[in-house]
Amino acid sequence: MTTTSFISNVRARALSTTQKLDWLGPLVARITLGVLFVSTGWGKVHSLAKVTAYFSELGIPFPGIQAPMVSFIELIGGALLVIGLASRIAALPLMGSMAVAILTAQRENVHGLPDLFGLVEWTYFALLLWVALAGPGKISLDHVLFGRNRAENKSRSLGPEFSGKAV
């Protein structure tokens, strides 16, 4: 066996294995984010006075409205992510919450892209963007109730040059 054929064989086996496990990444990311947001939302719901005062200190407009709204967005959105129901929709307000957190609570800590990319809020935003665009994955209520997710659909809107198949 030549070195080239050995490498090709190893590559083919690795690709086959990773394709069989392609459901794991979205599941772990979605559940991790969901549990995190359920936890922070629950904490905020049960400490609304403190959250409202903190939002007021940050200069967030209408803190008496925003604090409960963000609390329930995190609690309900996180729960939806955990079970994989309406995941793409749930990710959007959570992304908004992370964007506001970056622009208010973390604003003074960001002096460039390395600082931004070092924020946990940015990591959550990026993972939520992935869920919003790629969907919740095969192990989700969305998949059970509505069938194939976007990642499994053929790229109808992008045309044949992006479908991965030769034209």
Residue ranges and their predicted role:
Residues 1-46, 64-72, 76, 83-167:
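Extended, low-polarity transmembrane helix blocks
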Residues 48-60, 88:
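Short juxtamembrane and helix-loop transition motifs at transmembrane-helix boundaries
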